[in-house]
């Protein structure tokens, strides 16, 4: 779990930024309901991620094809887990709220890698480079109202899991959103992303901590 993380982002006032797959990992049939049809952008830590929330941010950009200029992220992640075919998966899921619109990287998701270059505080420059191999199934960006996501998961998708704690996760998301709406931000950190050209990144000053 310490090497796996995801980012559940909310666009104001109450829309969730998610991924939608057309087929399952196991089997090629197209269906209206299967495990992880709707999913949270997430992935595994790599050698460039200094902190686990950097894994969450990097995977969000790689999988959605979008990035944020300004966001408030709750600093305590939720440990989301589910069981599939006897294997239990665990991810540290960070929940955040985007200020303003998401920016488009202009590339198809998962066709590039993202490197985060840290600056002051949690300000990052992001560098995109082409990916030589892609083993991910095709997923598209989907942005839906929070309650619609909760209702869909509860009525259509949770019964595809042998077990999970998604119900507790939904309560956690509601709690984080309530704190944000009430301007109780002491447990949030502000993060910003700025895309730069790989050649420009080489000329930029080193990270500031």
UniProtKB/Swiss-Prot annotation:
Location of the Nudix hydrolase domain: 1-167
Species lineage: Viruses, Viruses incertae sedis, Naldaviricetes, Lefavirales, Baculoviridae
Domain of life: Viruses
Protein name according to UniProt: Uncharacterized 24.3 kDa protein
Transmembrane region(s): none
UniProt source species: Orgyia pseudotsugata multicapsid polyhedrosis virus (OpMNPV)
